[in-house]
Amino acid sequence: AKSLKSIAIIGPNADQVQFGDYTWSRNNKDGVTPLQGIKNRVNKNTAIHYAKGCSLTSLDTSGIAEAVEAAKNSEVAVIFGGSASAALARDYKSSTCGEGFDLNDLNLTGAQSQLIREVYRTGTPVILVLVTGKPFVIEWEKNNLPAILVQWYAGEQAGNSIADILFGEVVPSGRLTFSFPRSTGHLPVYYNYLPSDRGFYKNPGSYDSPGRDYVFSAPSALYSFGYGLSYTSFVYKNLSTDKDKYELNDTIHATVEVKNTGKYTGKEVVQLYVRDKASTYVTPVKQLRDFKKIELAPGETRTVQLQVPISDLYLVDEKNPVSYTHLRAHET
């Protein structure tokens, strides 16, 4: 933050506190906006160029030119988009998220997509921050922008907390609690989908090479449940269980070594998934059964133990025994 000479703060959620669904206030006096949070962190000599660019809902693009100029005059641009939510009885006309506010299309609302693309075309590095309570279709953003952060509705200290992450005071460690689809047409999309008689998704398509699952796309999520990145890196090894066979009342104790191989102290969410290898019933391709969040210093290694009661894996079948394979989801 101290080395930046200029930064563009852009977007409909840049100077607005989003407290979340069922919250009574939308007044910025009750919280810290992202714009204010960033101003609190940067050097006093850093130039802040703010431009709203567009609203969350309107198709009016007249403010985009100002945002483009702000980006051109800055070393980096941070765009705050997403959605808005509040108490059902207050300011409901500007809500795009929450109970009773469903979107028929999960593309970013209003002129947000155009704003992002025109700022991107300036050549200034762009960070997209989604302040939202729902997933959006952001495949273009994923393929073109160097960084995307999802903040959700962070409440009163939202501006200070996102500034801490943007400037490296805090290393991000969140994991998605639902999946982001590639398009609205890809819904429903789950991490724990049921396989068809063709098994796993093996033949995704593209315009250059049409496939079968989707002719011109992959049926998998753009970002799946459990996904999340960090400023540091982790390596897993020596996954093992305490026994090879278990009785009905037993609990599986699985251990794995996790090492922080990066330069920063960071938190990792160790996730244990299971998959039924053979069954007379159709079961999900994988299911999350346990997780633990740990903090490791650079170079530090820790053995993590995860537990799964056999009762959580029950499939009632008197004649055919079943076996499971342990999987882990580590996508940093």
Region spans (language model):
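C-terminal non-catalytic regions of proteins with extracellular/luminal or membrane-system context
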Residues: A1-R328
